[in-house]
Swiss-Prot record:
Keywords: Copper, Metal-binding. This is SCO2-like protein RC0895. The lineage of its organism: Bacteria, Pseudomonadati, Pseudomonadota, Alphaproteobacteria, Rickettsiales. Gene3D superfamilies: Glutaredoxin. The keyword Metal-binding applies. Belongs to the SCO1/2 family.
Length: 205
């Protein structure tokens, strides 16, 4: 009887472990983790990416999406206080522009802020001095930025600091969008995409 009792206890424990494991798996599948910078995915099937927008450039002038037409464009969403991801991506864009210019191909690099509170036209102008001189920096009010980020499926959220903290930080997706000469979305490149990968795609276009 003692052996039978021990067997029953073992069976109960195993059943409980299986139940807990199944519950954990179910919750994991139903509750996605908060995306980290550069890890958000864009599902292109039946999803329109891009669209018309009107913002303010680093010179304080109105800049709308029609001004992208006529040449290829690369668009990146970030903020000037970004410590590493944004500078890395903008440096890659600078490299791409320089390579294409050597082959007599014009491409316009565009940086759209997700932090309009701090990224004024003056702040953008100063920041973009560190990258290719062709860079266009765009800002606007919070609603304008929300509208354009929604159209490009951009994730961003405050992760450190509150409204009173001037040094708050943002987490955001890190894609570089390739726009064709008609102002239409062609493809997006990930944070870890190399300039070589981008060039290979452009050569095939």
């Amino acid at each position: 009887m003692k052996i039978q009792s021990n067997v029953i206890k073992i069976i109960i424990v195993i059943s409980l472990l299986i139940g807990v494991g199944a519950l954990y798996l179910l919750l994991s599948l139903r509750t996605p983790e908060k995306p980290l910078a550069g890890q958000v995915n864009i599902y292109e099937d039946n999803v329109k990416i891009g669209g018309d927008f009107e913002l303010i450039d680093q010179n304080g002038e109105i800049f709308n999406s029609d001004k992208l037409k006529g040449n290829l464009s690369l668009i990146y969403f970030g903020f000037t206080s970004c410590p590493d991801i944004c500078p890395t991506s903008l440096n890659k864009m600078t490299e791409i522009v320089e390579i294409l210019n050597k082959h007599k191909i014009d491409i316009l690099p565009v940086f759209i802020t997700i932090d309009p509170k701090r990224d004024t036209p003056i702040a953008l102008k100063e920041y973009l001095k560190h990258f290719h001189p062709k860079f266009i920096g765009l800002t606007g009010n919070e609603q304008q930025i929300k509208d354009v980020t929604d159209k490009f499926k951009v994730f961003y959220a405050r992760v450190h600091g509150d409204d009173d903290d001037p040094n708050y930080m943002l987490d955001h997706s890190s894609f570089t969008y390739l726009i064709d000469a008609n102002g239409k979305y062609l493809k997006h490149f990930y944070l870890d995409s190399s300039p070589k990968e981008m060039m290979e795609f452009l050569r095939n276009e």
